[in-house]
Structures are given as structure tokens and as C-alpha cells.
Amino acid sequence: PEIQKDFLKTLKFWADRGVDAFRIDVAHALKKDLSEPLRNLDVFEGLEQRGAKGKGILADRDELFKIYKEWRKLFNTYDPPRVAVAEAFVHPERLPLYASTKTLGQCFDFRFIDTPFEAGAYRNATQEAIELAEKNKSTCTWTLSNHDQIRHATKMGLNPAVNRRDWMLSNGTSHPLDMESGTNNGLAATLYILALPGSTYMYQGEELGLHEVTDIPESAIQDPQYLRNHKIDKGRDGCRVPLPWTKSGSSFGFGTGGSHLPQPNWFGSYSVEVEEKDAHSPLAIYRRALELRKELQAKEEIKWHKTSDVSVLHFSRPNGWHCITNFRAQEY
């Protein structure tokens, strides 16, 4: 009870000062079963062990939602109500419990992060998420990238059969990367999720079409995941390299004293300075897509339409807004 009171005090402190939203990190792990005898676990229990029952030992326990209901009561005392989004690695059937209007209201849906860029896979993932949200009177919260993942443009430019962890350990040299294809596929995926019902979160740098920085030297790696995992996983620094604002300079405009993580030379051509001058750049496409999304908002519904090509998906929203996505490797 004392910890819960302190959480509410802290949330209120920041909400009173105008903070609009809160991201709840590892939202599935605020409650644990510490009843004796304590269990002796060799590794942290994963999704397979926890399943969809809410009976995990260390995570995703049903007692969590009593806590989040109290938080929601606090958030709703503000006008407008404060937004909260859960980062919860849980069974898909559990996601709506975190995204309920009675709890946090939103929960990242990570299924697209590792969904192959294929029409069938995208449709199945979309339909499953929407049906689950509707069943629980919740909404979907889509994302393609975050600070813990290889940038999605890079994933989509690699052969799907490539072991990405081994590829990263080779500094991106063990298999070829098609950066152009990855960028184009990444843009198509973004336009797809922006047209879906629900909310969308974007990770800094994806609006520039940035790829993973794969060749950070060992001496410059800062992510403790690299050392903690005995160097069998290069870590997450490759997606955390500071953004390029200008096409040149000691840190491509990030600051005057250099960058805390090394930036590759190719960052200059992906800089804001360069892309703002190109009407067809990823930055221009993102800006226009966000404008259209705002203009075309409609009821949280979707209708699928048949296409003559299995590599093309077509859906519409109630106001006549249509989204047609080509998942083929070449132009249609």
C-alpha cells in the first residue's frame, strides 16, 4: 500500500505540471508472488510459462489491474484525462486488460515488430489484434520499432532467413542488406499501420528511414546487454545512435561535442537537412501521412476487400478511406 501511494503521489506531481502522458515500462511486472516457499527459477519465466491465465509468478498477475484502476481514476481527474500506455510483454489475449478504459487505456502491440513483411502475415496479425480488442472493448496500439529492437527498415531489407543476432555480431557483413528495399518496405508498413483503427507509436529516426548502425566497435558499445549476455548479443546501441540533423559536422548537428555513440558517414544523406529538401524523402512521406491520418479519422472499424494479387492487401474505413499495400519486392 505504501508503494502504491507513492506511485500515485509521483504521477500526480507530474500530471499537475502538465505532463500529458505516461509510458509504463515493464508494466507486467509490478506484482509478484513472493509467498513461501519461494520458487527457484533458473531463468525469468517467459510468455510460454505465463500463458493467458494471469497466473505468472513474477509477471502478468491479475492483481496488477487493481493498481492500474487506481491510476486511471487519478488520470481521469484531469481535463483532458492523462494518457498512459503499457509496455507489457504478455500473451496477446492479455493485452486488452492493460488497454482497458478502466486501466491504462493503451498497451503497445508488438506483434508487427517480428511479423514478416508478407500480405498474409500482416492481415492475420491485424485481424487477430482488432478482433481481440473488440471482444474486450479495447483498442489497438500499433508500432514497428522501439529502442530495444533492430530498426525495422533494416529487418525488411534482410533475407528473412538470416539470423539477425549473428548478423549483428558480424557487424552486418555476413549477409547483404538491401537498404533501398528495406526503406521502401518500411515506408509501406508505416502507411499501412497509420491507416488502421487505433493509435500508432513511432520510434525516433524511423521518420528519416534510418537503418541500424551495425558496425559500432566493441570499445564504443554502451549497452550493458552486450556484456551481461557474455557478448553473444551485440545489444541495442545500433538503433540508439543520435539522429543526424545536418549533412555534416562533428555529430551531424546533434551537438557541438560529438556523439556518445559513433555515427556512420552515411548518416549525412539521411539527415533532416537533406530530407527536408526532397519532396519524396521518408521525412516528407511521414509528414504527409500524419496530416492525412488526422484529416481522415473515422470510426474504429475496418473492412477487407478482395484483390487479384495475394501480395496486395486492401482495406477501407467507414468514411471511404482506402488503404492498398503492395507487399511484393517490386513495383506493382
Which sequence ranges carry the predicted segments?
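Active-site and adjacent substrate-binding regions of carbohydrate-active enzymes
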Residues: 1-332
